[in-house]
Structure formats: structure tokens, C-alpha cells
From Swiss-Prot:
GO terms for molecular function: ATP binding; heptose 7-phosphate kinase activity; heptose-1-phosphate adenylyltransferase activity; phosphotransferase activity, alcohol group as acceptor. This is Bifunctional protein HldE. The keyword Signal does not apply. Catalyzes the ADP transfer from ATP to D-glycero-beta-D-manno-heptose 1-phosphate, yielding ADP-D-glycero-beta-D-manno-heptose. It comes from the Bacteria. GO terms for cellular component: cytosol. The gene is hldE.
């Protein structure tokens, strides 16, 4: 059996799931800049930094994925003190995560990976970290927290990035507590010795990790099965899910036939963090009552969504639901009512994303509209397009407008790959819209002046700014309509 019928699965069940994540919490930092010269000191490029952003990394990215899917999350681990530790704790707290199990060790570095981006390329990565195993005293403190939390949770995820938190003794204790409480322990492994994960319910290595840890070069189905069998024996796990990149993933259980799920991504832009999405959706699906085969198929579907996004990304319930129902994600998941949009943007803002807002009628989409949207998208990380409802278009443009009704206009805008979210608003809701979106930048066409843009005072009050996009041509919807009425094609 290669596929599982997952189309009827209710992803809203994820919202009632409680998860404990134990592992190596990190900060992923990005320095975005421009390169225009070579240093006079050495033959290296000079990056003029324009923007700095940061987000949760490592086990923290698992937390990002879980919260984006609506789960309630607690974390346990060890971090350093200072600014990096405060930043890590602050980002977790902002997501509504219970951080009581996150210990502070002033003598330990909080893992921070700084990527320098210039000319749209990663030029350098700087790592600040400690790989030293945590002390037995710290292990016992985490165990006490876990003993209190696990009976209240539906699932435990151990995310190992090899930074010293998931010691052998801690893994042994977690396995015992989970077994006693009857809760699943899902492990994203690291390193060559999987015997430290003995007692795990399921382990989720990728192809390279599975090959290295098993000592079996995976080059076909037979070698894949040998590697899986060896790792199941070493780890004593009930299941192993091996992710295979473009070849999907494979689920193995002792004494059962392998279950293969083929990759679903239509296009792949970035595989960063896809493994964190897999373990998150796999775990939540199991917690929500799915079988392992269904959970694996759901995880595969979610992975297909995130790899089509640029950068380390997450998937939310709306996107996953739309994909499961074979509906265009562009329309079903991008269109959000204002309050739902506000919540989605708050999560992205906490991840350091720069939010761009543009608004308009978009009645008879033309070259000027396309240019506005394309140029707006280049200014940040997330583009929100607010579309005037039919009554607002009528008020602004007069009787006989809109030519294209609201529902169709929304579908057309949503179909553009550079657009992340679409919302519908009325003219008298503009202030409410801006306060909900809190854009870093509000864009309008070049036929305006900044102080003529409606809502500019609120944008500036909230710390944003207005950017005018020069018109690419003199075409307009009004002119097109007039030409048609005058019989000119």
C-alpha cells in the first residue's frame, strides 16, 4: 500500500493537542545586506548590513511548527544567559509557550547561528554554541519537569541537534516516563549511536542520517530496508520514519511491510527546516488519533507545502486543510478574515518577518497592478493584499463598477505566487485594517504623494512607512473600460 486516504482528516484537532518538546533550543539570526565593494584590508567582500532578523532554530523550530498548527506547547532544555538567552526565552514566551522547563546556565553559550546574506546569497555562517553535555543535576531538573508535564500532554518530541541537552541518561528517563504515562515519544535523532534513543516510539532520521548511523549505504529499496531494520534493532523503537527528500518518505515497523509515501511538492525552493515540519505533523496527527500510516501521509503532505516556500517556514491548519481537500492553496489558504489574518501575522512578526501591505480595487487586473505587487513583494518577507469589497469599489469608482466581482478578484490576486495573504475590507475599515496588519511598509502606486495615502498617519504612528511604487506604464482599469466602451481594442 503506497497511499493512505487522508482527505477526510480533521486538522482542527491539532488545536486541542498538548506537546512537550525537549531538546536543543537555538536562535537563527540573519544579517541582510548589500555588497558593493571589496575590503581594502583583505580580499573579501564588504556586506553593508541593512536589516537584522532572528527566529527560533533547532528544537525551537519544532516549536514554531507546532504553534503554527495550533498546538499548546511546553519546552524543556538548557540555554545560556545574557542577551541571546533573553532573546530565545522572549521568542518562546511570545508564542505562548510554557518555558518553566527551560533552565538557564550562565556558563553556557546559547546556540546562535548567524547567517550573513548579501546579493540574495548566504555568504557566511557564524556559529556560537556549546556542545558540552548538560550536567546530571540539570538532567534531573528536566526529569522532574517532565514527570509533572508528560501525564498532562498528548505527545513528547525529543529534538536532538547534538548540542548536549539530550544525553543518554535524559533519554532513558524520558522513555521510562512516557512508557508509564502511555504517551508517544517521537525522536528526531542526531549522531551515529541510536542506542541512546532506546524506548522511543518512533525515530525520524533523514536518508543521510539513517545511512551514517546504520553503516548501510542507502541506494535502493533493499538497502533502505536493511538500514531501517538495523536502526529499529539498535534503538528498540516501534517505528522508524525515514525522510527521503524528493523520493518522499518510508515508514518501517518490525515484522510489517514498508509503507512508502511519495513526495508531493510541485516545486522546491528551500528544504530548510522541513524535517521539523515532518516530526511536528507526524506527532500531532498521532496525538489526534491518526494511525501511523495516516500520520506519515499527513507529514508528507505538510512537507510538500513548506519546501515550496523560501526560507525556514511553517505550515498552518488552513494550508494543510486546503491541500488535503485538493483545493488551490492560493485561494483557500491565502484568503483570511481580519482577525485570523492578525493572528497569523503576529506569529510571523515574532519570527522577525517584515510585513508589507498594499490595498486597492484590483478591478480588471493589468500590468500596473502586477508591477505594484511584484515590487511590493521585494520590499519584505510577507505581502498582504487588501482588496476593496464590491460596495467600496462602487463608492470609489462609481456606478457600473466593479466589472469583476469581489470573489473573482480575490481568486485572481491569490493566484499570484508573490502574494502571501489576501483579505477583503470596506473603505470605512481602513484604519482597523492597518492596525490589525501593523505593516512595516504600506505601498501605493506612484500617482500618489506620501501624505495623500489614506491611513499614512496610522502606519507612521505604528512605526511603519509609506513606499510609492513608480508606475510601469500609463495603463489603468478606467482607461481599459473606456476603450472597450468606445470600441477600441
Amino acid at each position: 500500500m503506497e497511499t493512505e486516504n487522508i482527505h477526510s482528516f480533521d486538522v482542527s484537532l491539532f488545536s486541542s493537542c498538548r506537546v512537550l518538546v525537549v531538546g536543543d533550543m537555538m536562535i537563527d539570526e540573519y544579517l541582510w545586506g548589500e555588497v558593493s565593494r571589496i575590503s581594502p584590508e583583505a580580499p573579501v567582500q564588504v556586506v553593508e548590513v541593512k536589516k537584522t532578523t532572528s527566529t527560533l532554530g533547532g528544537a525551537g523550530n519544532v516549536v514554531n511548527n507546532l504553534t503554527a498548527l495550533g498546538a499548546k506547547v511546553s519546552v524543556a532544555g538548557v540555554m545560556g544567559g545574557g542577551k541571546a538567552g533573553d532573546l530565545l526565552n522572549g521568542k518562546l514566551t511570545a508564542l505562548g509557550v510554557n518555558t518553566e522547563g527551560l533552565l538557564v546556565d550562565q556558563g553556557r553559550a546559547t546556540t546562535r547561528k548567524t547567517r550573513v546574506i548579501g546579493a540574495n546569497q548566504q555568504m557566511l555562517r557564524i556559529d556560537r554554541e556549546s556542545k558540552q553535555e548538560i550536567s546530571e543535576e540539570q538532567v534531573q531538573a528536566i526529569v522532574r519537569f517532565a514527570q509533572n508535564q508528560i501525564p498532562q500532554c498528548d505527545l513528547v518530541i525529543a529534538s536532538d541537534y547534538g548540542k548536549g541537552v539530550l544525553t543518554r541518561s535524559l533519554m532513558e528517563e524520558l522513555a521510562k516516563i512516557c512508557k508509564t504515562a502511555g504517551k508517544a515519544l517521537i525522536v528526531d535523532p542526531k549522531g551515529m549511536d541510536y542506542s541512546k534513543y532506546k524506548g522511543a516510539t518512533c525515530i525520524t532520521p533523514n536518508k543521510k542520517e539513517a545511512s551514517q548511523a546504520s553503516g548501510v549505504e542507502i541506494k535502493d529499496q533493499a538497502s533502505l530496508e536493511r538500514a531501517a531494520a538495523k536502526l529499529l534493532e539498535i534503538a528498540g523503537a516501534e517505528k522508524i520514519l525515514i525522510t527521503l527528500g524528493k523520493d518522499g518518505m518510508a515508514l518501517f515497523s518490525p515484522g510489517e511491510e514498508p509503507f512508502r509515501v511519495h513526495a508531493q511538492a510541485r516545486q522546491v525552493f528551500d528544504v530548510s527546516g522541513a524535517g521539523d515540519t515532518v516530526i511536528s505533523v507526524l506527532g500531532l496527527s498521532l496525538a489526534a488519533g491518526a494511525s501511523y500510516k495516516t500520520a506519515a501521509a499527513l507529514a508528507n503532505t505538510a512537507a510538500g507545502i513548506v519546501v515550496a516556500k523560501v526560507g525556514t517556514a511553517t505550515v498552518d491548519q488552513a494550508e494543510l486543510k486546503a491541500q488535503l481537500q485538493d483545493q488551490p492553496i492560493a485561494y483557500q489558504a491565502k484568503l483570511k478574515p481580519l482577525q485570523e489574518l492578525k493572528s497569523a501575522l503576529e506569529n510571523l512578526r515574532r519570527q522577525g518577518k517584515k510585513i508589507i501591505l498594499t490595498n486597492g480595487c484590483f478591478d480588471l487586473l493589468h500590468e500596473g497592478h502586477i508591477n505594484l505587487l511584484e515590487q511590493s513583494r521585494k520590499l519584505g518577507d510577507v505581502l498582504v493584499v487588501a482588496v476593496d469589497d464590491d460596495e467600496s469599489v462602487r463608492m470609489v469608482k462609481g456606478q457600473g463598477r466593479p466589472i469583476i466581482r469581489e470573489r473573482e478578484r480575490v481568486k485572481i490576486i491569490s493566484a499570484m505566487t508573490g502574494v502571501d495573504f489576501v483579505t477583503v475590507f470596506s473603505t470605512n475599515q481602513l484604519d482597523e485594517l492597518i492596525r490589525a496588519v501593523k505593516p512595516d511598509i504600506l505601498t501605493k502606486g506612484g500617482n500618489y504623494k506620501p501624505d495623500q495615502v489614506l491611513g499614512h498617519e496610522i502606519v507612521e504612528e505604528l512605526g511603519g512607512r509609506i513606499v510609492l511604487i513608480p508606475d510601469a506604464s500609463d495603463v489603468s482599469s478606467t482607461r481599459i473600460i473606456q476603450d472597450i466602451r468606445n470600441g477600441r481594442g
